[in-house]
């Protein structure tokens, strides 16, 4: 059983916004926020996005299809965009492995006081081994900072080998929510069914769905982001991403909506509080938001 009472679930629709490159500065950050408002209005979902989810970006291996340049700090980005997005709160990911305990505590204090309702702790990039990095392990952070951060998140990758045990341990350590990797199959349904049968933890699940524009056919960023060489389940997801990228807009919407329905219908009765995390990996656009609008029309957190 969970030793502590769960915080109230976020029950939210969160939109991922990646901080701009440092060299693009404040104006680009402001334009990102204004684009969210404009695309929300055009797609008819004004007021439906309750949080922005800002990832703490770290340099990964050199195979990344789009070069990783230094990004604006999460906190700096949030302070620029928050006044432009009234009523919207923050979620973020925080890399823990390169900060010692006092430095991480200071960072989390600043994030919490700035309006971040949930912080997901993430580890080293995949070019490094778990345990590398001189700082705090993400699983330790889940318990160390339970008095400081109410909603403490962990990344959940349902197709990853050994993920049942890994996610159970994260919940035991104090994770109150799991944020999934981008979902391009309904593997999360069987994962959560098995998880619910095996233990009594019922963390909130942020189900992540990403729009796939035509550009993916040429660039392959999403294909790279979800990669897990030798994993047939992920290979099938990568094929679905290719299909989405090559599809006409109406077909693309239909395919993504069908996936969304299968996931929502499959996990809705398992007893997990649910939130939705939406991502336009190549940038905010009206076609992405029109797709998100159809998904949210089918089911939205907090809707009767």
What are these regions (language model features)?
Residues 118-155, 159-176, 180, 188, ...:
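Conserved anion-binding
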């Amino acid at each position: 059983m969970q030793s502590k009472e769960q915080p109230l679930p976020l029950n939210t629709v969160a939109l991922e916004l990646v901080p701009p490159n440092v060299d693009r500065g404040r104006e680009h950050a402001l334009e990102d926020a204004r684009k969210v408002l404009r695309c929300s209005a055009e797609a008819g979902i004004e007021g439906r996005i309750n949080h922005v989810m800002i990832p703490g970006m770290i340099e990964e291996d050199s195979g990344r299809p789009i070069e990783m340049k230094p990004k604006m700090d999460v906190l700096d980005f949030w302070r620029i965009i928050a006044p432009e997005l009234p009523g919207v709160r923050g979620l973020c990911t925080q890399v823990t492995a390169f900060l010692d305990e006092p430095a991480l505590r200071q960072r989390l204090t600043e994030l919490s006081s700035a309006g971040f309702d949930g912080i997901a702790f993430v580890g080293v990039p995949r070019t490094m081994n778990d345990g590398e990095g001189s700082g705090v392990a993400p699983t330790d952070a889940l318990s160390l900072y339970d008095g400081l951060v109410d909603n403490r998140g962990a990344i959940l990758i349902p197709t990853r080998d050994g993920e049942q045990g890994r996610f159970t341990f994260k919940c035991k350590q104090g994770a109150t929510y799991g944020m999934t990797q981008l979902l391009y199959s309904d593997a999360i349904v069987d994962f959560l069914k098995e998880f619910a049968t095996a233990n009594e933890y019922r963390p909130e699940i942020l189900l992540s769905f990403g729009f796939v524009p035509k550009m993916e056919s040429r660039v392959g960023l999403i294909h790279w982001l979800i990669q897990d060489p030798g994993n047939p389940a992920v290979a099938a997801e990568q094929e679905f991403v290719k299909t989405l990228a090559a599809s006409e807009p109406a077909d693309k919407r239909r395919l993504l909506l069908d996936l969304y329905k299968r996931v929502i219908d499959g996990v809705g009765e398992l007893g997990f509080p649910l939130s939705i995390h939406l991502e336009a990996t190549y940038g905010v656009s009206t076609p992405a938001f029109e797709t998100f609008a159809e998904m949210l029309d089918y089911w939205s957190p907090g809707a009767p």
